A protein has these predicted regions:
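Hinge/cleft segment of the Venus flytrap/periplasmic-binding protein
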Residues: 280-331
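Pocket-lining segment of extracytoplasmic ligand-binding domains
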Residues: 175-245, 251
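Beta-alpha junction/loop-to-helix N-cap segments that form part of ligand/metal-binding clefts
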Residues: 65-129, 226-241, 245-250
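Short beta-strand elements in bilobed, periplasmic/extracellular small-molecule ligand-binding domains
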Residues: 56-76, 137-138, 187-203
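Extracytoplasmic "Venus flytrap"
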Residues: 25-51, 56, 65-75, 226-231, ...
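Hydrophobic alpha-helical segments within soluble ligand-binding/sensing domains
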Residues: 24, 120-165, 265-285
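Short, low-complexity disordered leader/linker segments with a strong preference
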Residues: 1-29, 85, 331
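An alpha-beta-alpha
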Residues: 31, 49, 139-191, 291-308
Length: 331
């Protein structure tokens, strides 16, 4: 009987420790921010996060250290492990790859509030949008642009004629690209829109795939989220525009690079949202009581150079709300 009682007490103690890990009890905490690459959007999100912490009067209580891996996955892993070994109380990975790495390295030992992850469920960071896994202790903010929003916008601006299809392109090596491609394809299936899907491996391959298109067969091209091509969109954008095929992206960087249209995200607000979650956790809210929070204040972005080249006239409601940009060439 004593052995059984001891076992029960041990289990209760373990459960208490596990529960305590999701709730902050310290007056001062160390927060490690990790990002794989240096990007203007990440800078904006980081500054927004710090501003929210400062507005809460907690800049001297929530001590933040930010490190970048400069594009090297091995360095990113080392940074996260350093946060673990250094006794950090909370890790904030920026974007999907660092978030995936953080949950695998931390294994539920350190709470994680990720920032700007496209789909934490698809990426196996959370079991669903509202549930924190005890194995990962991760929640945070998402910047995903709904597939129905982008596709219906494309249909309104460049209607699908009889016999035409949508051409969906995605980077086969990027989790976010696969995720947004599948969401777009599923939405097209649900609406009965005809479409084709093709994968590419890099920017030159995307141009090769585009050159093989028949302009009379497709109403437009939809490019799934891809940080590589978003930063180097000029070649693909120019190729499709010269062919007379409108191309829609899911990041405003794509529009600045030569896509006709996308929806933009204010990453300062994403940072504010993440900062709010950090403040709430610091003040005692359990991690499991904080579902993933989704950004929803999307703004329409139109490339006026591409619009003019294609001779497209925007519907009045879109023209009234759009932010216009011109093509920016990558260095």
């Amino acid at each position: 009987m004593k052995k059984v009682l001891a076992l029960v007490l041990a289990v209760i103690m373990l459960m208490a420790v596990a529960a305590a890990e999701t709730v902050n009890t310290k007056e001062t905490i160390k927060v490690g921010v990790v990002q794989l690459v240096d990007m203007a959007d990440s800078d904006s999100a980081y500054e927004g996060m710090l501003a929210t912490i400062a507005e809460a009067g907690l800049s001297d209580k929530i001590i933040v250290e930010r490190q970048s891996a400069a594009g090297d996955a091995g360095t990113m892993t080392t940074i996260i492990q350093g946060f673990v070994d250094g006794g950090y109380d909370l890790i904030v990975p920026v974007l999907t790859p660092p978030a995936q790495a953080a949950v695998n390295i931390c294994g539920g030992e350190i709470p994680i509030i990720f920032m700007s992850v496209v789909d934490p469920v698809y990426s196996k960071i959370m079991p669903d949008w509202n549930t924190v896994s005890p194995d990962f202790l991760a929640t945070g903010t998402s910047n995903t642009i709904p597939a129905d929003l982008m596709i219906e916008t494309a249909n309104d601006i460049t209607p699908i004629a009889e016999g035409e299809k949508i051409f969906i392109m995605y980077n086969t090596s990027q989790n976010n690209a696969q995720c947004t491609m599948e969401a777009a394809a599923a939405y097209c299936d649900s609406m009965g829109y005809a479409y084709d899907v093709v994968g590419y491996t890099d920017v030159p391959d995307s141009v090769t795939q585009a050159n093989a298109l028949d302009p009379d067969e497709y109403a437009y091209v939809y490019v799934a989220l891809d940080s590589v091509i978003a930063a180097n969109f000029n070649q693909l954008g120019e190729t499709l525009t010269e062919m007379g095929i409108p191309v829609y992206g899911v990041a405003d960087a794509m529009t600045k690079g030569g896509a006709l249209c996308s929806y933009g995200v204010d990453y300062t607000i994403v940072g504010n949202m993440t900062g709010e979650m950090i403040v709430e956790w610091y003040n005692g809210t359990a991690l499991e009581d904080m579902p993933c929070r989704r950004y929803s204040e999307f703004s329409l972005v139109i490339n006026s150079d591409v619009q003019a080249a294609l001779g497209i006239e925007l519907p009045e409601d879109y023209a009234a709300q759009a932010t216009y940009v011109t093509t920016v060439r990558a260095n």
